[in-house]
Amino acid sequence: MAASTASHRPIKGILKNKTSTTSSVVASAEQPRRTVEEELSKKSQKWDEMNILATYHPADKDYGLMKIDEPDTPYHNMIGDDEDVCSDSEGNEVMTPEILAKKLAAAEGSEPKFRTREQESSGEEDNDLSPEEREKKRQFEMKRKLHYNEGLNIKLARQLISKDLHDDDEDEEMSETADADSMNIEESNQGSTAGDHLQHKSQSS
């Protein structure tokens, strides 16, 4: 029986039949005509903007930005002892070359206070260290000094190399001139012996 009902059904194709289009036209004619506004409201979408803001822009969202929690770069103010060398109150005066030379001469012998503090604090830290740690720290400081002076060492090495090359060039030039002089002397000696030999032949004949 199931087979007989399946065989009686019409096979539906992909394309619309003419009868199906006419039936939809009849059905639409039966429905009351809607206004244009209802048609537009049916097709358009309404956005819930507050929901969009809450979804995509929550208050606690950080947008991948980092907050850096570290102290500002320290600024070392001039200590009270350095007021005679450099003073902000003297900034109002006209700076002449003589005054500048005096200030530079006065500041040349003194070391900045923050460096002396660092040296004092490093001396206090050495007392707390064991002998192995002191030796390790001393070696580290020595290697650090060598590393930071490496640029100066390279510059000096380049100067020495260029000086050696220049000296080698001068030595080669001197040896070449000495060789040329010895060759000239030998040629003149050979020429004079040949001349003597010719004179001797002419006298004997």
From Swiss-Prot:
UniProt-listed PANTHER family: PROTEIN PHOSPHATASE INHIBITOR, PROTEIN PHOSPHATASE INHIBITOR 2-RELATED
Region Required for binding PPP1CC catalytic center, displacing metal ions and inhibition of PPP1CC catalytic activity, annotated ranges: 147-150
Tissue specificity note: Central nervous system.
Gene Ontology biological process terms, A to Z: glycogen metabolic process; intracellular signal transduction; regulation of signal transduction
Protein name: Protein phosphatase inhibitor 2
Location of Phosphoserine modifications: S44, S87, S89, S121, S122, S130
Keyword Phosphoprotein in record: yes
Listed GO CC annotations: dendritic spine; growth cone
Record field: compositional bias (Basic and acidic residues): 31-44, 110-120, 131-142
Phylogenetic lineage: Eukaryota, Metazoa, Chordata, Craniata, Vertebrata
Coiled coil: none
Region feature (Disordered): 1-44, 104-142, 163-205
Assembly behavior: Heterodimer with PP1.
Low complexity biased stretches: 19-29
PTM annotation (Phosphothreonine): residues: T73, T96, T116
GO molecular function, one term: protein domain specific binding
UniProt xrefs under InterPro entries: PPI-2
Residues where N-acetylalanine is found: A2
UniProt keyword terms in alphabetical order: Acetylation, Carbohydrate metabolism, Glycogen metabolism, Phosphoprotein, Protein phosphatase inhibitor
